[in-house]
């Protein structure tokens, strides 16, 4: 089995070290990551400048660095470095990736969703912690490592569920033993814009958000309120589904306007 290991936090993230260790011995693993942190880049691709690839050694193992986004990594890995993998694993992200709002902006998820578009299943791992240090050592690190290893091995052994293209896995900030399959909440944060002025009096803006109340039965509630490991299945076919009848009125009016 060929496994591509990636993330959006760059080569020196303790979450990447956990993921590299978790897949060791499962097959032929290749590690390809953005050369610098690329959080919140979603499915973004670099189309306005060339991409560079470098290589370094971490703990005696090769790690390839791409001067782009996690989505860029997928295409560079497949076409330049290692060929098409059987599985992509991404993470372990510093911070949770909960809700549709965050899933669609996350670089960690962007990598596995981009791979899914190319027909390769993927698993994204995230931990609801505030700092990298929490994944560097101690009982919590061991919990995340053991859980990640167990999930990857279970998926490899059982195979990906039918109709599922990617799995979004989130670990709570506390050691847990309960694992639940849940839907994503719609939102994780309320959004706001702060306007400020620079020394020249020109305005600039910061985007930020406050956590919203967790929807019961959602990934946000399971991880942040109940302290459980949440697995959320994601399907591209769900995004592609449509009902022609639902748009019949709109289509009719457009046709009438164009026929005048």
UniProtKB/Swiss-Prot annotation:
Protein keywords: Cytoplasm, Hydrolase, Metal-binding, Nucleotide-binding
The protein's Enzyme Commission number: 3.1.3.5
Q: Does the keyword Hydrolase apply?
A: yes
GO CC annotations, alphabetized: cytoplasm
Task: Give GO terms: molecular function aspect only.
Answer: 5'-nucleotidase activity; metal ion binding; nucleotide binding
Question: Catalysed reaction(s)?
Answer: a ribonucleoside 5'-phosphate + H2O = a ribonucleoside + phosphate
Record localization: Cytoplasm
InterPro entries named in the record:
SurE, SurE-like_Pase/nucleotidase, SurE-like_sf
Is Cytoplasm tagged as a keyword? yes
Question: What residue ranges carry the coiled-coil annotation?
Answer: none
| The protein's enzyme class | hydrolase
What the record notes about the co-factor is: Binds 1 divalent metal cation per subunit.
Q: Could you tell me which Gene3D superfamilies the record lists for this protein?
A: Survival protein SurE-like phosphatase/nucleotidase
Q: Which cofactor does it need?
A: a divalent metal cation
Q: Which domain of life is it from?
A: Archaea
Residues annotated as binding a divalent metal cation are 8-9, 39, 93
HAMAP family with a match to the protein in the record: SurE
Q: Which family does it belong to?
A: Belongs to the SurE nucleotidase family.
Q: What does this protein do?
A: Nucleotidase that shows phosphatase activity on nucleoside 5'-monophosphates.
Query: What's the protein name?
Result: 5'-nucleotidase SurE
Q: What is the native source organism of this protein?
A: Thermofilum pendens (strain DSM 2475 / Hrk 5)
The taxonomic lineage of its organism, from the top, reads:
Archaea, Thermoproteota, Thermoprotei, Thermofilales, Thermofilaceae
The gene is surE
